[in-house]
Amino acid sequence: MTQGVLLFAQNNSHIDYVKQAQFCASRIKKYLQLPVCLATDNLEYLKQNYKNYKVYFDEIVELQRHPVNYRKKFRDGLYSEKTLEWRNLSRADAWDVTPFAKTIVMDTDLIIGNNTLLKAFDYNQEFLIAKESI
């Protein structure tokens, strides 16, 4: 049975989620020693801007890019905020796109600093969500 981490990276006009995903994947490799799958709607951007992406991502799933009508406020500090498009609907398809039998779906801005998340694989449940964070 394979285990791995699935990251979604769908950039908007201001946030490079692919860059975040690459950093996140480097931490996953260091602390969890798990394969990482990147699901993105801009494969060409990944290939052009991150030439060494295969070091970080074991699998790539190309998502269809759809027009987005969703907008979200992003806050950067106390006095700065921007309302930007938010491409997050594909996460609902995580079970359909993951190449792993057991998958941790992780936000790209999560910074891993230990192997605590590996405990998630000890549970025989179809869906787990953290009630408290450490």
Language model region names:
Residues 1-134:
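Glycosyltransferase catalytic domains, chiefly GT-A lineage
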